Amino acid sequence: MDKTLSRNEAKELMQLLGLDMTCWGNLPLMRTKYLSKCKEFHPDKGGNEEKMKKLNSLYLKLQECVSTVHQLNEEEDEVWSSSQVECTELCCNFPPRKYRLVGEVYGDVFEEYILKDWDICLKGFYYLCNCFYCFLDKRHKQKYKIFRKPPMWIECYCYRCYREWFGFEISAETFFYWKKIIFLTTMQGVGLTR
């Protein structure tokens, strides 16, 4: 999300939303807080008009930039085949799948698909694995080869981009929060469908 807002703008937006910077990039949470803060800051409700204007301008700028990044990702869809990651559950057959959250599509079997083996997948030893972690990591490498620049968080939803963007180490805790973001993001946003 380095192409969305400057660091100072991002900090200001997160401060207005009442969120810690560790939540930067968790778009579903940010949206929920934005709607809540709109009610709180609205001048007709006795709120602060200046804060409301600043919140709106920063949030709308973020939305426009994220939309642009997602459009660029859609143009890159030819890099992979949707058959590389598939759900055989009945729930996956109902359209429009690409606009549904990953958690809605995979439901109870999400945990089975997110990571096959912690030790093997995180070290990159199992190149035939099609768990979400390995698939998104392979996609990260493909994007790097094609565009000759490393993709960043939101351009790429892999665990590596998540950790690099937020400055986290590999740990069960950071993995837990990454998979929660994947769970609450659309199939199209993550890049798991066309």
Swiss-Prot record:
Domain of life per record: Viruses
Keyword Transcription tagged: yes
Subunit annotation: Interacts with host PPP2R1A; the interaction inhibits PP2A activity.
Zinc finger (C4-type): 121-134
Physiological role: Promotes efficient viral genome replication by accelerating both G1 and S phase progression of the cell cycle. Inhibits host PP2A by binding to the A subunit, thereby displacing lower affinity regulatory B subunit. Inactivation of PP2A in turn results in the transactivation of cyclin A and cyclin D1 promoters. Late during the infection cycle, ST may induce dephosphorylation of host MTOR, leading to the inhibition of cap-dependent translation. May establish and maintain high levels of viral genomes during persistent infection in cell culture.
Spans traversing the lipid bilayer: none
Organism: WU polyomavirus (WUPyV)
Sites of N-acetylmethionine modification: M1
Record carries keyword Zinc: yes
Zinc finger (H1C3-type): 140-161
Domain J residue range list: 12-80
This protein's domain notes: The common region of ST and LT proteins comprises the J domain. This domain is essential for multiple viral activities, including virion assembly, viral DNA replication, transformation and transcriptional activation. This domain is also required for cyclin A-transactivating activity of ST.
Protein name: Small t antigen
Any single Gene Ontology cellular-component annotation: host cell cytoplasm
Pfam families referenced in this protein's UniProt entry, alphabetically: Papo_T_antigen
Keywords: Acetylation, Activator, Early protein, Host cytoplasm, Host nucleus, Host-virus interaction, Metal-binding, Oncogene, Phosphoprotein, Transcription, Transcription regulation, Zinc, Zinc-finger
Molecular function GO labels: zinc ion binding
Subcellular localization(s) per the UniProt record: Host cytoplasm; Host nucleus
